[in-house]
């Protein structure tokens, strides 16, 4: 039986995306820093930086999907506090960026091979990286949206402490 949660689909604008039920990723915060992963050369948009994430399964919530993908790609999952979910709606397809705070130390391990590397970085460093096109397009809005989230007061629109 075919897995209905996999494959490319087109949104209302004709853009191609992975996952007919949408996708979700986890933007993990540790104090002022966030965790990014460099995608393996073997995956779509390889060798770019993004957050762990992927296609949602049928009926799966963005929170559950983001945590599942994070654990698969980075070999584990810390205890989390959900802060917010940003939705990038493309019309017929959406990407959900789940923002969460790590409530315990977390050290990524080798996961399913989709991540070639990972790093903690300040929000100000993000724009200087070679980003996944979808993440690059939403990063300015995400960075601005981080300002004022519970526990993150004092970040300016670029995600820097003011």
What does each model-found stretch correspond to?
Residues 1-25:
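Acidic, metal-coordinating catalytic segment for phosphate/diphosphate chemistry
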Residues 30-72:
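Conserved Nudix-box catalytic region and its N-terminal flanking loop in Nudix hydrolases
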Residues 76-86:
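A short coil-to-beta-strand element that immediately follows conserved catalytic motifs
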Residues 145-160:
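Compositionally biased, intrinsically disordered low-complexity segments enriched
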Residues 29-30, 89:
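Generic beta-strand structural signal
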Residues 84-113, 117-125, 138-142:
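Active-site-adjacent beta-strand/loop module that shapes the phosphate/pyrophosphate-binding cleft
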């Amino acid at each position: 039986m075919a897995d209905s949660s996999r494959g490319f689909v087109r949104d209302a604008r004709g853009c191609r995306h992975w996952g007919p039920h949408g996708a979700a990723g986890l933007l993990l915060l540790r104090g002022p820093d966030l965790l990014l992963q460099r995608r393996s050369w073997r995956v779509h948009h390889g060798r770019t930086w993004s957050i762990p994430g992927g296609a949602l399964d049928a009926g799966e919530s963005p929170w559950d999907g983001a945590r599942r993908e994070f654990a698969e790609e980075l070999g584990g999952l810390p205890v989390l506090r959900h802060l917010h979910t940003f939705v990038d709606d493309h019309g017929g397809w959406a990407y959900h960026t789940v923002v969460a705070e790590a409530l315990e130390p977390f050290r990524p391990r080798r996961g399913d091979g989709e991540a070639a590397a990972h790093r903690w970085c300040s929000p100000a460093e993000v724009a200087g990286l070679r980003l996944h096109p979808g993440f690059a397009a939403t990063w300015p809005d995400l960075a601005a949206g981080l300002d004022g989230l519970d526990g993150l007061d004092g970040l300016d629109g670029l995600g820097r402490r003011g």
